[in-house]
Amino acid sequence: MTRPDTLFSALPRVPLATLPTPIHDAVRLRRALGGDRRCPRILFKRDDLTGLALGGNKARKLEFLIADACRREATSVVTTGAVQSNHARMTAAAARAVGLGVTLVLTTREPAPPKQGNYLLDRLFGATIHLIAAGPDPRIAVAPDEEQRVSEVVEEMTRRGERPYVIPVGGSSGVGALGYAAGTLEIVEQLKELNLKPSRLYYASGSRGTQAGLELGARLFMPPYRLCGVAVSGGEDEKRVRAARIANEAAALVRAQVTITAEELVTDQQHIGEGYGISTREGLQAIRLVAEQEGILLDPVYTAKAMAALLADVRAGDASPDETIIFLHTGGVPALFAHAGSFQ
């Protein structure tokens, strides 16, 4: 039987993240929610502290994706996302860290988006940026012509003699999903060392690459918790199919005899609000609460909505005070500055 610590060793990987990230015991947050008589123990898995370009979960995916780009002798990477995409920001940084060029196709609802937050950082990393109009449905994160525009950009680059490597939105591919399959092993080992057996792990879910990796990791390493994904954008049916495909592609890469079906990949749809990238009242309240109690910053687009789901379950009594739960902090802090008006 393959040892868990050698499962990923044969795969190309570039060390971009500062690992392992710590597990933080949110004692004051628990106290604010009623103490140990009313609130479960809450742990934060601090993937906001991965280190790459202000941190975040994408560093784990990019360790495998950038390595694959280098293996294929790419000269540049191309990826896409919203104008305040955490993934785009971290991809730009990762590419620069290994000497690759970077081109971003970013969706926007403004013809001239302000140079702040992640968009400012993209420009500081010297990314070539193509802006396209976002789609009409704010709940859907991907623009209708996004894939076509990426293809056009890749064709243009190829004609110029470049060798572009395309990274899907969110780094959500079989290669990218390896990041959180490996990340699950890290969590399992930390929990064993701390003698902890949490019952559930909450995380924000967008393009579903993180979900795919966590689901694969759960089947490979059997953590004690069940996964509680919280959707931050719409398109659930299509995304379930995508997540299953990605997870199974990742399983094949590590030669794991695992099959994951779309029906297994459920996420909480109650906290999307008006749409992707649009803050919610409950999310903003969660940001303030966690900041004031723990000195930890969440972001309005992803982690605030996931924390709002966790808080709703605690307040409804769905999580017992005897339980321990984990919140996967996936980063995204630069987006706070792009949403400053929400806090006035």
Q: What do the PLM-derived regions correspond to, one by one?
A:
Residues 1-344:
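PLP-dependent amino-acid enzyme catalytic core
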